[in-house]
Swiss-Prot record:
This is Cytochrome b. One of its GO terms (molecular function) is metal ion binding. Keywords: Electron transport, Heme, Iron, Membrane, Metal-binding, Mitochondrion, Mitochondrion inner membrane, Respiratory chain, Transmembrane, Transmembrane helix, Transport, Ubiquinone. It comes from Ctenomys coyhaiquensis (Coyhaique tuco-tuco). Binds 2 heme b groups non-covalently. The chain crosses the membrane at residues 33-53, 77-98, 113-133, 178-198, 226-246, 288-308, 320-340, 347-367. Its cofactor is heme b. Component of the ubiquinol-cytochrome c reductase complex (complex III or cytochrome b-c1 complex) that is part of the mitochondrial respiratory chain. The b-c1 complex mediates electron transfer from ubiquinol to cytochrome c. Contributes to the generation of a proton gradient across the mitochondrial membrane that is then used for ATP synthesis. It is found in: Mitochondrion inner membrane. InterPro entries: Cyt_b/b6_C (IPR005798), Cyt_b/b6_C_sf (IPR036150), Cyt_b/b6_N (IPR005797), Cytb/b6-like_sf (IPR027387), Cytochrome_b (IPR030689), Cytochrome_b_C_euk/bac (IPR048260), Cytochrome_b_N_euk/bac (IPR048259), Di-haem_cyt_TM (IPR016174).
Length: 379
């Protein structure tokens, strides 16, 4: 008799993806983030669903409905803060996941990588629209500033902005459509994740050495299922500690003030996970130039497979490239810090230098260093 797990049309898909999947024997904890992102997505959809049951997408009641969730709904505060801090965890894992891909050369799986970059854009769009929903000061002004950037697009810009707003300013129509998109996007993201995994399973996972591991594979279950469960346990401990002890640590106090179109906050800034891109945007004293730099700061990820000039795939055995990689990480941390600072001296100059260094490192330094390493190894 055949095993149902291997013969049933639906169950065998799960079997080939999570049970009998041949996986490299040497993948480290850096390979845990994919599963953690999956758990994050599930958690966000679940908590978001319960929040949507009590939320009202109307400018007059949105802020009050969020307050009502926190005060009157059973464990509403828990659901709300798990959703808000879950988004932060999501982005931490996303950045680790991308960093892992860059360090170990996983971007040479071009289909998987490009779908991943599109996923990043989709998640960023979802998070941005979610931040608008509580209709606090930073929600309103964040939405105004970011949507206004589209007016920099030549010819169609101003019309496009009014079309997105559904009027002549960020108002009821904007909030309603942002709620609709914020609700639907995670399901589109889920579908994209499935495509991401489909492409990944065509090639199999990369590993820290960057070499072909076909000769040394182990079954995903039980080895990596137990490893993933440990990662999930650590994630839940971190998330619940954040939610229970310092739920507002990563938020903005301005968002506890209801949105007021007549009063601009002194410092308009997005959530922490967008600050690096926001710093790049602000470092260019031209609207269109800033918007292009902002888009290319993420889109540049798609160039990694093209810019790869080393004879080795991974950075594991390339100390010079490793130095540059960590320089890039430090650079992004500096950009994140600058994004949260007011637009004044010396922050403007630091931001401009960090923005130039970001693009220079990726486009010039990393490929040329890889070529130099090839030469040093007489390859």
């Amino acid at each position: 008799m055949t095993n149902t797990r291997k013969s049933h049309p639906l169950i065998k898909i799960v079997n080939h993806s999570f049970i009998d999947l041949p996986a490299p024997s040497n993948i480290s904890a850096w390979w845990n983030f994919g599963s953690l992102l999956g758990v994050c997505l599930g958690l966000q959809i679940l908590t978001g669903l319960f929040l949507a049951m009590h939320y009202t997408a109307d400018t007059t009641t949105a802020f009050s409905s969020v307050t009502h969730i926190c005060r009157d709904v059973n464990y509403g505060w828990l659901i709300r803060y798990m959703h808000a801090n879950g988004a932060s965890m999501f982005f931490i894992f996303l950045y680790f996941h991308i960093g892992r891909g860059i360090y170990y050369g996983s971007y040479s799986f071009m289909d998987t990588w490009n779908i991943g970059v599109l996923l990043l854009f989709a998640v960023m769009a979802t998070a941005f629209m979610g931040y608008v929903l509580p209709w606090g000061q930073m929600s309103f002004w964040g939405a105004t500033v970011i949507t206004n950037l589209l007016s920099a697009i030549p010819y169609i810009g101003p019309t496009l902005v009014e079309w997105i707003w559904g009027g002549f300013s960020v108002d009821k129509a904007t909030l309603t459509r942002f709620f609709a998109f914020h609700f639907i996007l995670p399901f589109i993201i889920t579908a994209m994740v499935m495509i991401h995994l489909l492409f990944l399973h065509e090639t199999g996972s990369n590993n820290p050495s960057g070499m072909n591991s076909d000769s040394d594979k182990i079954p995903f279950h039980p080895y990596y299922t137990i490893k993933d469960i440990l990662g999930i346990l650590f994630m839940m401990i971190t998330l619940m500690s954040l939610v229970m002890f310092t739920p507002d640590l990563l938020g903005d106090p301005d968002n506890y003030t209801p949105a007021n179109p007549l009063n601009t906050p002194p410092h308009i800034k997005p959530e922490w996970y967008f600050l690096f891109a926001y710093a790049i945007l602000r470092s260019i004293p031209n609207k269109l130039g800033g918007v292009l730099a902002l888009v290319f700061s993420i889109l540049i990820l798609m160039l990694f497979p093209i810019l790869h000039s080393s004879k080795q795939r991974s950075m594991s055995f390339r100390p010079l490239s490793q130095c540059l990689m960590w320089m890039l990480v430090a650079n992004l941390l500096i950009l994140t810090w600058i994004g949260g600072q007011p637009v004044e001296h010396p922050f403007i100059t630091i931001g401009q230098l960090a923005s130039v260094t970001y693009f220079f490192t990726i486009l010039i330094l990393m490929p040329s260093t890889a070529l130099m390493e090839n030469k040093l190894l007489k390859w």
